[in-house]
Amino acid sequence: SRFKKLLEHCPGTRFCLEHLLRSPGSDVAQPPYAGYAEALQCAQWPNTTVKIPGRGEILKKPGRLPVGYPWDTIPPHYEMAKAAFGVQRMMWGSNFPPCAAKEGYRNALTGVRDMPLFQSGDDADWVMGKSAARLWGFSV
């Protein structure tokens, strides 16, 4: 794709790839996730970091949203992104203000921070701050 050519031609530029590399309504949301796997090929460039939003970004909001996460089935996008980028190139982003109408800011934050996927070692620390600090040139 043209974007991958841009990544190839700009190795000194840091890229923050938004929304788990998903675009609303695209085939990346449908099993077997071939479109998403193709988008994750951007991870081969070490100057890329993926921003991960709350689950409300990829799941339909229930009619009445309680505190916590009411979703039973969550597509494997977070796991696939972690396998491709590793936690040191993943950073949480609230997607505020749209998250307020989806899962709410608190759920967008805690849903990623407390995800079992990020409970090993300092994975959550990387996703919730260290990766962003490193990407933007702060000491980690």
Predicted regions, residues:
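Catalytic pocket-lining loop regions of alpha/beta-barrel enzymes
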Residues: S1-M91
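Divalent metal-coordination and catalytic microenvironments
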Residues: H19, V50, N95, A124, ...
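Mid-to-C-terminal alpha-helical segments outside catalytic/metal-binding sites
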Residues: E79-M91, A100-V140
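Short Gly/Pro-enriched loop/turn and capping motifs at secondary-structure junctions
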Residues: R55-E57, F96-C99
